[in-house]
Amino acid sequence: MIIPSLDFIHGKIVRLYQGNYNNKISYKKDIFKQIEKYIYQGATYIHLVDLDGCNNPENRQKSMFNIFSNFKNVSFQVGGGIRSKRDIENLFHAGVSKIVIGTSAILYPNKFKKWLKNYGSKNFVLSVDININTKKENKIAIQGWKKTTEINLDDAIKQFIPYGLKNILCTDISRDGTFSGPNISLYKYLKNKFPNIVLQSSGGINSISDIYNLKKNNVEHVIVGRALLENKFTFLEASKCWLKE
């Protein structure tokens, strides 16, 4: 599936370059109209990232909850600074389909295991955002990508598999918002290492051929943000490519 992605700060659509808050593009696009556009072209699932929530969960935007109440005919997957039971229950109560957890899962794995058990593993997506170091090791970044840990990608994922986790969103930070193409070899590696996961790719999409290559390498879902906002191709074009055998 092609999943359109919208990141926002203060209710405005933005894109960060490699996760850098000081290097962001702001778009003069109304978030409600942009969602309507994607739905009109056939989108049934949308990925939202609350960048204010990443910095401070207390700043989780009311506009996000307005989106959920305005669009009942589409499913939402939401990430950004989700750290507590209250955050999770508020989002599920608002009608969110899946909640994306990154930093909280890495820093507090036992808490995330409990959430998987209590709320159902199918309702969560583990977000593993990686920096590839000079030794070609995939190290997990946290806290809005501001800090890179010594935790390896494999270790981050495998600890949650016994708790039913299947949905994995993996971003190569060096590709995010760059139009440099997705890291196909990374996703091939993940699908070989963890054949039963449902993998979402994110970062670097520049063309329809990127979509084709990801599908060819058994990626289940492709998150596309900047390429759609800047009209590299339309959601409809991407979806048609995805549905081709």
UniProtKB/Swiss-Prot annotation:
InterPro entries documented for this protein: Aldolase_TIM (IPR013785), His_biosynth (IPR006062), HisA_bact_arch (IPR006063), Isoase_HisA-like (IPR044524), Isoase_HisA-like_bact (IPR023016), RibuloseP-bd_barrel (IPR011060)
Please verify whether the record's keywords include NAD: no
GO molecular function list = 1-(5-phosphoribosyl)-5-[(5-phosphoribosylamino)methylideneamino]imidazole-4-carboxamide isomerase activity
Gene Ontology terms: biological process: L-histidine biosynthetic process; L-tryptophan biosynthetic process
User: Which major enzyme category is it?
Assistant: isomerase
Could you tell me what reaction this enzyme catalyses? Answer: 1-(5-phospho-beta-D-ribosyl)-5-[(5-phospho-beta-D-ribosylamino)methylideneamino]imidazole-4-carboxamide = 5-[(5-phospho-1-deoxy-D-ribulos-1-ylimino)methylamino]-1-(5-phospho-beta-D-ribosyl)imidazole-4-carboxamide
Record's subcellular location: Cytoplasm
NCBIfam families per UniProt: 1-(5-phosphoribosyl)-5-[(5-phosphoribosylamino)methylideneamino]imidazole-4-carboxamide isomerase (TIGR00007)
UniProt-recorded name of the protein: 1-(5-phosphoribosyl)-5-[(5-phosphoribosylamino)methylideneamino] imidazole-4-carboxamide isomerase
